[in-house]
Structures are given as structure tokens and as C-alpha cells.
């Protein structure tokens, strides 16, 4: 699998919103969620080469500011970003990659082998960085992406997810 001239190696927030509206990969193909569930502001690098396994990589960022919606409700007087939102962002990015390389279908998170949380995202943080290292992409009747991910806040690794799985489905009727 190699990139084509229509693919970009980075995407702005406006590009990501276009993906959420079905304007990037087509209406019945991979989409990102809309805000508030869109958990990144930009993709700074995406490639089908490189990364830890030589199969591709994605680097994306979320700017942290104290007025993000989740700080008001998680938790009162102890605001912290829910770790599950960081995990969801890694699934979002893996699904984006599957659409970016040209696979059809709607993305669904299918699982993760192991997740470790070793830090937290507080309202005083500045930037969350997601790094996705592709391990394998199966592009047959079933489209499946397998990857590892690291999430860091202000340069410190705080989450590790191994064996993320996302599938693309041309029909989700039986799902």
C-alpha cells in the first residue's frame, strides 16, 4: 500500500471536521466524530511507511485548555480528562488511517489487547500528542487495522495501548 497524490501527510482541524461530515473519504466511508467527541485538533503526520513496525504511523495533537467540556464534569473539584477519551482518540485515528489508505466502509472500534494508564491530563496541561504505530492492515472482505499507540501530555508518555483493533464495514446491519 502506498500513498497517492490525493493524500496529504497532515490535516488541519477543518480537514478533520470535513472527514466528520463525510466529505473526505465519502459519505459511507470512514468518518471521525464531530465535536465534542472529536479528540484531536490536527494530524501533524500520517504515512503508510515508517513507525515502530515499518507499516505506517500517525501523529496527532489535541490542544488542552481549562474550558474543555469534560473538565466540568469529571470530576467536580478534581478535574481530569477521562482516560477513555484518550483511548477513543487512538481508535479514531486508526479508523482515519484505514480510510486514508483507500479502504471503504464505516469504522468501528473492535477492541484493544492491553491498556496502561500511568499519568493524567489536567486543565493546566498544554498539549496531548497521540502516536499510532501500525502493525498490520488487512484489506480483504474484512478491513481491519491493528496498531499500538502512545499518548503523551506535554512530552511525557501517560497512556499505552497495545493491539488496538478497528474494522471498516460496508454494512453495519448485523453488527
Swiss-Prot record:
Organism: Alcanivorax borkumensis (strain ATCC 700651 / DSM 11573 / NCIMB 13689 / SK2)
Record GO biological process: unsaturated fatty acid biosynthetic process
Gene Ontology cellular-component annotations: cytoplasm
Major site of localization recorded for this protein: cytoplasm
Active site (record annotation): 74
PANTHER family reported in the protein's UniProt record: 3-HYDROXYACYL-[ACYL-CARRIER-PROTEIN] DEHYDRATASE (PTHR30272), 3-HYDROXYDECANOYL-[ACYL-CARRIER-PROTEIN] DEHYDRATASE (PTHR30272:SF8)
Gene name in the database record: fabA
Organism classification: Bacteria, Pseudomonadati, Pseudomonadota, Gammaproteobacteria, Oceanospirillales
Subunit structure: Homodimer.
Taxonomic superkingdom: Bacteria
The name this protein goes by in its record: 3-hydroxydecanoyl-[acyl-carrier-protein] dehydratase
Annotated localization: Cytoplasm
Catalytic activity entry: a (3R)-hydroxyacyl-[ACP] = a (2E)-enoyl-[ACP] + H2O; (3R)-hydroxydecanoyl-[ACP] = (2E)-decenoyl-[ACP] + H2O; (2E)-decenoyl-[ACP] = (3Z)-decenoyl-[ACP]
Family: Belongs to the thioester dehydratase family. FabA subfamily.
Free-text function comment from the UniProt entry: Necessary for the introduction of cis unsaturation into fatty acids. Catalyzes the dehydration of (3R)-3-hydroxydecanoyl-ACP to E-(2)-decenoyl-ACP and then its isomerization to Z-(3)-decenoyl-ACP. Can catalyze the dehydratase reaction for beta-hydroxyacyl-ACPs with saturated chain lengths up to 16:0, being most active on intermediate chain length.
Biochemical pathway: Lipid metabolism; fatty acid biosynthesis
Record's keyword terms, sorted: Cytoplasm, Fatty acid biosynthesis, Fatty acid metabolism, Isomerase, Lipid biosynthesis, Lipid metabolism, Lyase
A single MF term (Gene Ontology): trans-2-decenoyl-acyl-carrier-protein isomerase activity
Pfam families: FabA
EC id: 4.2.1.59, 5.3.3.14
Amino acid at each position: 500500500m502506498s500513498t497517492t497524490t490525493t493524500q496529504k501527510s497532515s490535516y488541519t482541524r477543518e480537514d478533520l471536521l470535513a472527514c466528520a461530515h463525510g466529505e473526505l473519504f465519502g459519505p459511507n466511508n470512514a468518518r471521525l466524530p464531530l465535536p465534542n467527541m472529536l479528540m484531536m485538533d490536527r494530524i501533524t503526520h500520517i504515512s503508510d511507511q515508517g513507525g515502530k513496525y515499518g507499516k505506517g504511523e500517525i501523529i496527532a495533537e489535541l490542544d488542552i485548555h481549562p474550558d474543555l467540556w469534560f473538565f466540568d464534569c469529571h470530576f467536580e473539584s478534581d478535574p481530569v480528562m477521562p482516560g477513555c477519551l484518550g483511548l477513543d482518540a487512538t481508535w479514531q485515528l486508526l479508523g482515519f488511517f484505514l480510510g486514508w489508505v483507500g479502504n471503504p466502509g464505516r469504522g468501528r472500534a473492535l477492541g484493544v489487547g492491553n491498556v496502561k494508564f500511568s499519568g493524567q491530563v489536567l486543565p493546566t496541561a498544554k498539549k496531548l500528542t497521540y502516536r499510532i504505530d501500525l502493525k498490520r492492515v488487512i484489506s480483504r472482505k474484512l478491513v481491519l487495522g491493528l496498531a499500538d499507540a502512545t499518548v503523551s501530555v506535554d512530552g511525557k508518555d501517560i497512556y499505552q495501548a497495545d493491539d488496538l483493533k478497528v474494522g471498516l464495514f460496508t454494512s453495519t446491519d448485523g453488527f
